[in-house]
Protein backbone atom coordinates (compact mmCIF):
# COMPACT_ATOMS: atom_id res chain seq x y z
CA UNK A 1 0.00 0.00 0.00
CA UNK A 2 2.87 2.38 0.78
CA UNK A 3 4.08 2.18 -2.83
CA UNK A 4 0.82 3.74 -4.03
CA UNK A 5 0.94 6.76 -1.69
CA UNK A 6 2.49 9.89 -3.23
CA UNK A 7 4.83 11.98 -1.10
CA UNK A 8 2.37 14.87 -1.31
CA UNK A 9 -0.01 12.88 0.89
CA UNK A 10 2.63 12.62 3.61
CA UNK A 11 3.23 16.36 3.37
CA UNK A 12 -0.50 17.03 3.69
CA UNK A 13 -0.72 14.76 6.73
CA UNK A 14 2.22 16.51 8.40
CA UNK A 15 0.75 19.91 7.61
CA UNK A 16 -2.63 18.99 9.04
CA UNK A 17 -1.32 17.17 12.12
CA UNK A 18 2.28 17.75 13.21
CA UNK A 19 2.32 21.39 12.14
CA UNK A 20 -0.74 22.07 14.27
CA UNK A 21 0.45 20.46 17.49
CA UNK A 22 2.08 23.65 18.75
CA UNK A 23 -1.17 25.55 18.42
CA UNK A 24 -3.10 22.69 20.03
CA UNK A 25 -0.68 22.71 22.97
CA UNK A 26 -0.94 26.48 23.36
CA UNK A 27 2.62 27.07 22.13
CA UNK A 28 2.54 28.98 18.81
CA UNK A 29 6.37 28.96 18.69
CA UNK A 30 6.52 25.18 18.23
CA UNK A 31 7.02 23.85 14.71
CA UNK A 32 7.92 20.53 13.12
CA UNK A 33 10.98 19.78 10.98
CA UNK A 34 10.61 16.72 8.73
CA UNK A 35 13.88 15.10 7.68
CA UNK A 36 12.77 11.86 6.02
CA UNK A 37 9.60 10.31 4.55
CA UNK A 38 8.96 6.70 3.55
CA UNK A 39 6.82 7.83 0.62
CA UNK A 40 9.92 9.50 -0.88
CA UNK A 41 11.90 6.26 -0.57
CA UNK A 42 13.51 6.93 2.81
CA UNK A 43 13.76 4.19 5.41
CA UNK A 44 11.44 5.91 7.89
CA UNK A 45 9.26 8.92 8.58
CA UNK A 46 11.53 11.08 10.71
CA UNK A 47 11.59 14.56 12.15
CA UNK A 48 11.67 16.64 15.30
CA UNK A 49 9.87 19.50 16.98
CA UNK A 50 11.67 22.81 17.28
CA UNK A 51 10.67 25.67 19.56
CA UNK A 52 11.42 29.04 17.97
CA UNK A 53 11.92 32.41 19.62
CA UNK A 54 8.72 33.88 18.15
CA UNK A 55 5.23 32.76 17.19
CA UNK A 56 5.15 31.01 13.83
CA UNK A 57 2.94 31.91 10.90
CA UNK A 58 0.85 29.00 9.56
CA UNK A 59 3.21 28.39 6.63
CA UNK A 60 6.21 28.27 9.01
CA UNK A 61 4.93 25.51 11.27
CA UNK A 62 6.20 22.74 8.97
CA UNK A 63 9.65 22.72 7.39
CA UNK A 64 11.36 20.03 5.32
CA UNK A 65 15.11 19.54 5.82
CA UNK A 66 16.08 16.41 3.90
CA UNK A 67 19.78 17.21 4.29
CA UNK A 68 19.49 16.79 8.07
CA UNK A 69 19.21 13.69 10.21
CA UNK A 70 16.88 13.66 13.14
CA UNK A 71 18.37 13.30 16.62
CA UNK A 72 18.92 9.76 17.87
CA UNK A 73 16.08 8.39 19.96
CA UNK A 74 16.97 8.03 23.64
CA UNK A 75 14.36 5.94 25.51
CA UNK A 76 15.62 7.25 28.84
CA UNK A 77 14.73 10.83 27.86
CA UNK A 78 11.40 10.03 26.26
CA UNK A 79 8.28 10.99 28.21
CA UNK A 80 6.28 8.19 29.78
CA UNK A 81 2.57 8.22 29.12
CA UNK A 82 0.16 7.84 32.00
CA UNK A 83 -1.33 4.92 30.08
CA UNK A 84 1.77 2.87 30.91
CA UNK A 85 0.22 2.17 34.32
CA UNK A 86 -3.36 1.73 33.14
CA UNK A 87 -5.11 -1.62 33.61
CA UNK A 88 -5.55 -3.58 30.34
CA UNK A 89 -9.28 -2.88 30.10
CA UNK A 90 -8.83 0.88 30.26
CA UNK A 91 -6.02 0.79 27.70
CA UNK A 92 -8.10 -1.29 25.28
CA UNK A 93 -11.02 1.11 25.64
CA UNK A 94 -8.76 4.11 24.95
CA UNK A 95 -7.36 2.47 21.83
CA UNK A 96 -10.87 1.64 20.64
CA UNK A 97 -12.10 5.19 21.13
CA UNK A 98 -9.02 6.59 19.38
CA UNK A 99 -9.59 4.37 16.35
CA UNK A 100 -13.31 5.17 16.25
CA UNK A 101 -12.55 8.89 16.28
CA UNK A 102 -10.74 8.52 12.96
CA UNK A 103 -13.85 7.17 11.29
CA UNK A 104 -16.17 9.67 12.96
CA UNK A 105 -13.98 12.42 11.53
CA UNK A 106 -13.29 10.89 8.12
CA UNK A 107 -16.86 10.20 7.01
CA UNK A 108 -18.18 13.78 7.40
CA UNK A 109 -14.92 15.13 5.95
CA UNK A 110 -15.34 12.96 2.85
CA UNK A 111 -18.81 14.42 2.30
CA UNK A 112 -17.48 17.95 2.78
CA UNK A 113 -14.70 17.44 0.23
CA UNK A 114 -16.38 15.17 -2.34
CA UNK A 115 -20.07 15.81 -1.92
CA UNK A 116 -22.56 13.19 -0.77
CA UNK A 117 -22.91 11.14 -3.95
CA UNK A 118 -19.20 10.80 -4.70
CA UNK A 119 -18.32 10.23 -1.04
CA UNK A 120 -20.81 7.38 -0.78
CA UNK A 121 -19.36 5.84 -3.93
CA UNK A 122 -15.67 6.21 -3.07
CA UNK A 123 -15.77 5.60 0.68
CA UNK A 124 -18.49 2.97 0.43
CA UNK A 125 -16.31 0.84 -1.85
CA UNK A 126 -13.31 1.33 0.44
CA UNK A 127 -15.36 0.28 3.46
CA UNK A 128 -16.62 -2.78 1.62
CA UNK A 129 -13.05 -3.79 0.78
CA UNK A 130 -12.02 -3.36 4.42
CA UNK A 131 -14.90 -5.59 5.50
CA UNK A 132 -13.97 -8.24 2.96
CA UNK A 133 -10.31 -8.23 3.95
CA UNK A 134 -10.61 -8.14 7.73
CA UNK A 135 -13.73 -10.19 8.42
CA UNK A 136 -11.89 -13.44 9.11
CA UNK A 137 -9.46 -11.75 11.51
CA UNK A 138 -12.32 -9.99 13.29
CA UNK A 139 -14.17 -13.28 13.76
CA UNK A 140 -11.04 -14.89 15.12
CA UNK A 141 -10.55 -12.05 17.61
CA UNK A 142 -14.17 -12.36 18.72
CA UNK A 143 -14.08 -16.16 18.92
CA UNK A 144 -16.88 -16.47 16.38
CA UNK A 145 -17.27 -18.73 13.33
CA UNK A 146 -16.44 -17.01 10.04
CA UNK A 147 -19.03 -19.00 8.11
CA UNK A 148 -22.65 -19.98 8.59
CA UNK A 149 -26.08 -18.57 7.99
CA UNK A 150 -27.90 -15.36 8.81
CA UNK A 151 -27.96 -16.04 12.55
CA UNK A 152 -24.19 -16.42 12.72
CA UNK A 153 -23.62 -13.14 10.88
CA UNK A 154 -26.16 -11.36 13.07
CA UNK A 155 -24.22 -12.61 16.10
CA UNK A 156 -21.10 -11.04 14.60
CA UNK A 157 -22.88 -7.69 14.16
CA UNK A 158 -24.06 -7.74 17.77
CA UNK A 159 -20.53 -8.47 18.97
CA UNK A 160 -19.17 -5.58 16.90
CA UNK A 161 -21.84 -3.25 18.30
CA UNK A 162 -20.93 -4.16 21.86
CA UNK A 163 -17.25 -3.74 21.05
CA UNK A 164 -18.03 -0.14 20.09
CA UNK A 165 -19.82 0.48 23.37
CA UNK A 166 -23.34 0.06 21.93
CA UNK A 167 -26.06 -2.44 22.68
CA UNK A 168 -27.77 -4.51 20.00
CA UNK A 169 -30.26 -7.34 19.88
CA UNK A 170 -31.39 -10.03 17.45
CA UNK A 171 -34.89 -11.07 16.42
CA UNK A 172 -36.44 -13.06 13.60
CA UNK A 173 -36.01 -16.52 12.15
CA UNK A 174 -33.04 -18.57 11.03
CA UNK A 175 -33.46 -17.37 7.45
CA UNK A 176 -34.34 -13.72 8.08
CA UNK A 177 -32.70 -12.08 11.06
CA UNK A 178 -33.05 -8.47 12.19
CA UNK A 179 -30.32 -6.80 14.23
CA UNK A 180 -31.63 -3.82 16.21
CA UNK A 181 -28.71 -1.46 16.79
CA UNK A 182 -29.95 1.55 18.81
CA UNK A 183 -28.10 4.81 18.15
CA UNK A 184 -24.61 3.75 16.98
CA UNK A 185 -22.21 6.12 18.76
CA UNK A 186 -19.74 5.84 15.91
CA UNK A 187 -22.17 7.52 13.51
CA UNK A 188 -23.69 10.19 15.75
CA UNK A 189 -22.72 13.82 15.35
CA UNK A 190 -20.58 15.56 17.96
CA UNK A 191 -23.73 17.06 19.46
CA UNK A 192 -25.47 13.68 19.56
CA UNK A 193 -27.58 14.34 16.47
CA UNK A 194 -28.46 11.32 14.32
CA UNK A 195 -26.16 10.64 11.36
CA UNK A 196 -26.93 11.79 7.85
CA UNK A 197 -28.19 9.07 5.48
CA UNK A 198 -24.99 9.40 3.43
CA UNK A 199 -22.88 8.55 6.47
CA UNK A 200 -25.04 5.51 7.20
CA UNK A 201 -24.66 4.43 3.56
CA UNK A 202 -20.85 4.64 3.72
CA UNK A 203 -20.72 2.82 7.05
CA UNK A 204 -23.00 0.09 5.75
CA UNK A 205 -20.36 -0.78 3.14
CA UNK A 206 -18.21 -2.22 5.92
CA UNK A 207 -20.87 -4.78 6.82
CA UNK A 208 -21.74 -5.49 3.18
CA UNK A 209 -18.10 -6.46 2.67
CA UNK A 210 -18.01 -8.56 5.82
CA UNK A 211 -21.18 -10.36 4.76
CA UNK A 212 -19.64 -11.05 1.35
CA UNK A 213 -16.80 -12.85 3.10
CA UNK A 214 -19.23 -14.69 5.39
CA UNK A 215 -21.75 -15.95 2.81
CA UNK A 216 -22.23 -14.53 -0.68
CA UNK A 217 -25.75 -15.96 -0.72
CA UNK A 218 -26.92 -13.49 1.94
CA UNK A 219 -27.70 -9.78 1.64
CA UNK A 220 -27.88 -6.94 4.14
CA UNK A 221 -30.42 -4.13 4.05
CA UNK A 222 -31.85 -1.42 6.24
CA UNK A 223 -35.50 -1.84 7.10
CA UNK A 224 -38.36 -0.33 9.05
CA UNK A 225 -38.75 3.09 10.64
CA UNK A 226 -35.12 3.17 11.64
CA UNK A 227 -33.91 3.79 8.11
CA UNK A 228 -32.67 7.31 8.96
CA UNK A 229 -31.01 6.08 12.20
CA UNK A 230 -32.91 8.56 14.39
CA UNK A 231 -33.90 5.74 16.71
CA UNK A 232 -31.03 3.48 15.77
CA UNK A 233 -30.61 1.01 12.94
CA UNK A 234 -32.47 -2.13 11.97
CA UNK A 235 -30.20 -4.33 9.86
CA UNK A 236 -31.83 -7.26 8.07
CA UNK A 237 -29.76 -10.30 7.07
CA UNK A 238 -31.55 -12.59 4.65
CA UNK A 239 -31.03 -14.72 1.52
CA UNK A 240 -30.43 -12.87 -1.73
CA UNK A 241 -33.39 -12.68 -4.06
Language-model features and meaning:
Residues 17-22, 207-208:
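Short amphipathic alpha-helical segments
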Residues 2-13, 27-44, 50-241:
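N-terminal accessory segment detector
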Amino acid sequence: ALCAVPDEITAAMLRGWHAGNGVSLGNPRLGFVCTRTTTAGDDCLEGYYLEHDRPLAPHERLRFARDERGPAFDPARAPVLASASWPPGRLEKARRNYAMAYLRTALPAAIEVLGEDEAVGVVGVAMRQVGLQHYLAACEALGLPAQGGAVQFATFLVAMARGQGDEAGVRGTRRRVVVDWPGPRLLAGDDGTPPRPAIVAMWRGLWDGALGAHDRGLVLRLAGPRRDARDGLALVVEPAG
